[in-house]
Amino acid sequence: MIEMYRKILVPTMGEYMDELIEHTLDLLHGREAEVICLYVVDTAVPFLTPKKVKEMMVKELTQRGNEILRDMEKGLTGPENPNVSFRAVMREGDPADEIVKVAEEEDVDVIVMGTGKSLVDKHLLGSVSEKVVHYAPCTIHLVRTV
């Protein structure tokens, strides 16, 4: 029997957004729950990247993150999903570390995320999802994205 998830964390980079929304709503089965969508601005850049270039990259990624979070909210809420409470969170840092931190801070019941694997690495999980699987304090629902 599937647990009654009341607080769900959905980290996204914008890829596979429709699949993440679909799986999240399937887990809810129309029940009341809070969905926290997380976008992490990955601030890791090569060592010799000029400061101005890094600042520009972070600004662009932040703008993209805001757009993605708005799209996620549209897909998860509305008249067809009246029991879903939505909250958007944006962080900067290492994506896997931030996902685990938010899961701990928010005491979430489950994380719904894509595998992140590519056709080249189809025998492995994506590095972010692999790290989250090992360190997350809760159940992980991985959505196959390839």
From Swiss-Prot:
Transmembrane parts of this sequence: none
Coiled-coil stretches noted in the UniProt entry, renumbered to this chain: none
UniProt xrefs under Pfam families: Usp (PF00582)
Source organism, top-level taxon: Archaea
Similarity comment: family membership: Belongs to the universal stress protein A family.
Protein's recorded name: Universal stress protein MTH_1154
Species of provenance: Methanothermobacter thermautotrophicus (strain ATCC 29096 / DSM 1053 / JCM 10044 / NBRC 100330 / Delta H) (Methanobacterium thermoautotrophicum)
Upper taxonomic lineage: Archaea, Methanobacteriati, Methanobacteriota, Methanomada group, Methanobacteria
